[in-house]
Amino acid sequence: MGIFNKVTKTFQWGDQTVVMETGEIARQASGAVLVSIDDTVVLATVVASRSIKPGQDFFPLTVDYIEKTYAAGKIPGSFFKREAKPSEHETLTSRLIDRPLRPLFPQGFFNEVHLVIHTLSLNPEVDADIAALIASSAALALSGIPFNGPIGAARVGYIQGEYRLNPGPTARKSSQLDLVVAGTEAAVLMVESEAQQLSEEIMLGAVVFGHQQGKVAIDAIHELVHAAGKPVWQWEAPARDEALIARVAALADDKLRAAYQIRNKQARTEACRAAYAAVLAQLQADGVECDTVKAEGLLFDIEAGIVRSQILAGEPRIDGRDTRTVRPIEIRAGVLPRAHGSALFTRGETQALAVATLGTERDAQRIDALAGEYDDRFMLHYNMPPFATGEVGRMGSTKRREIGHGRLAKRALVAVLPTKEEFPYTMRVVSEITESNGSSSMASVCGGCLSLMDAGVPMKAHVAGIAMGLIKDGNRFAVLTDILGDEDHLGDMDFKVAGTTAGITALQMDIKIQGITREIMQVALAQAKEARMHILGKMQQAIGQAKTEVSNFAPKLYTMKINAEKIRDVIGKGGAVIRALTEETGCQINIEEDGTITIAATDAAKADIAKRRIEQITAEIEIGKIYEGPVTKLLDFGALINLLPGKDGLLHISQIAHERVERVSDYLSEGQIVRVKVMEADERGRVKLSMKVLAERPAPGSDRFGTGSERPAPGSDRPALAEREPRREMRDHGHPPSEQQQQQSPPADTGSGQRVG
């Protein structure tokens, strides 16, 4: 008998085969499950502390999602050649896993829980995040840790009018929707989505479809737990001290009710702090044995009860609004004189200063993802310093919350951005939250859209975002439009919806209770649409459409197309040609594999110079066309004439003049500018020229230098020539011609040119 007690559960999920295993790997953890979906393999482990840290007053859940580069057969590209700090994708996936799991731990459970998920193998067409959600749910369910799960999860696409289960990256390219939903058997817990302006009905249908498909995974997890689950912890919620609760309520109720009559956030916060301090002082004076953490927890419950009961009773909200009213909005565009685009968006006590910057293709962010590298030409970064909430705090590295809010705002705007062909710029938006009292991420959506329009980005439509809240008690509920920070803190849901007049572009839902129903989501989406239309009207009044020209401080981009076979000519040996061209013009020049060239310059004249130079470098020599160029080299049997940058032709000795030429140097000298006509080119691209066809045949006894180009006197100065690219000497021009060949008449001028090659 082996040392492992391995249990395996296999089930079919749409077109995919899912295998869940436990009992072989990570046996020291409280729970460990290995999930395989068509060669994507994820290991989820969970460990929980058996004791609570002194003074702990919140649930300390930590989720770490880690991608190993060996999963895709790669070695890390860093100096140390090992995985370092989490990537943005890893951080976002950690949040994606955390959000549906956190509400399922019981109230009062403050033991530390650490969930670690490793991606061990990756099939590029099977996303690891869904496998990670299922593995995490299964690991918690069989660990014995107090947990009201399991949950199921699914990704939903919308392709050609049909919902698709777990579409891979390739399929999603043709999908109008990328939605991830997670929930229990009874209700939805989390939604994260990006959409191409879809209706509320389609979005709600996608959530319901995904929730139903997730139940397949829940059933399989139940079977795995039945076969391999560990004993459930003997944990009970701390006993309620009814006498203390009554005493605290008697001391605090009137004070907190009075505080919540104050409309201003800062004044209200100070009043609540004063109430807390007064109650704690009175308890101490009365000799009541109660630690501060416990007393503050009771005070928070009283706060929540006051706010929630008032809203459910139909009374005005904290700031005096009803459930459907959006706070006053003020918009000012172009607030920063030298920024490429900017907008100050203020909604009540929430304010975002959004700044847009335009760059070239070289400014795009290079993403070294596990599934492969790619360039991202649109970035949105969200920053919220402590002063935005009137607090003192440390400024350090970007926090998970800031990364998540930035990605949500980015998702909302992607659907209306112009294509690279329509607008070849790289775009970056930075949302600086200067005030925050609820829904700062949605303020970033509004401000970000306006700043891009101010920068001259041809957006397809305006995009606005709104955050919806929920107060639920039994069968009674109230959906709140444009929630405040306190309503988010004391309520049951944060449901963010962004979109245009045509439909939804992004949706995110976070739940604090164990699920919401279809009815609640339907009401929330309807109210969100009403609020979105109101905000869009305000935005359109501020900026009706994008500026037709980019800022004078932004680089101007000019595109041109060349034959892909000519790319090497523009680049030159070792990059010499393009480097010299860049230094000469001061422009940035980017060349794509298909021959598309983008020239970036702040000076249009310099861009024109660069464009003309590239046209000269890539131009084809045409048969029958007349060129003017310098003599680059004298040969015994003729001369090399530069026709175009890097392109020479052979002027044979017999084609210099009508009379017999004994020595080329009697007629030509290096550097002399001559006019020649292209007569022919052979299969190897060698070009033959003629001077004499451009000159009239001289009358008997006339000057022998009647060739259309006066021969310079030996040693005379010649006009200075513009710097040119290094010449390439033509080879295999043949042997000196015979006397009969020298006397042969040239071919007649055909007039119109014919391109060589």
UniProtKB/Swiss-Prot annotation:
The keyword Transferase applies. Its cofactor is Mg(2+). Its main location: cytoplasm. Its EC number is 2.7.7.8. Residues 720-736 have a biased composition (Basic and acidic residues). Pfam families: KH_1, PNPase, RNase_PH, RNase_PH_C, S1. It catalyses: RNA(n+1) + phosphate = RNA(n) + a ribonucleoside 5'-diphosphate. Residues 693-757 are annotated as: Disordered. Keywords: Cytoplasm, Magnesium, Metal-binding, Nucleotidyltransferase, RNA-binding, Transferase. Mg(2+) binds at D488, D494. Involved in mRNA degradation. Catalyzes the phosphorolysis of single-stranded polyribonucleotides processively in the 3'- to 5'-direction. This is Polyribonucleotide nucleotidyltransferase. It comes from Verminephrobacter eiseniae (strain EF01-2). The gene is pnp.
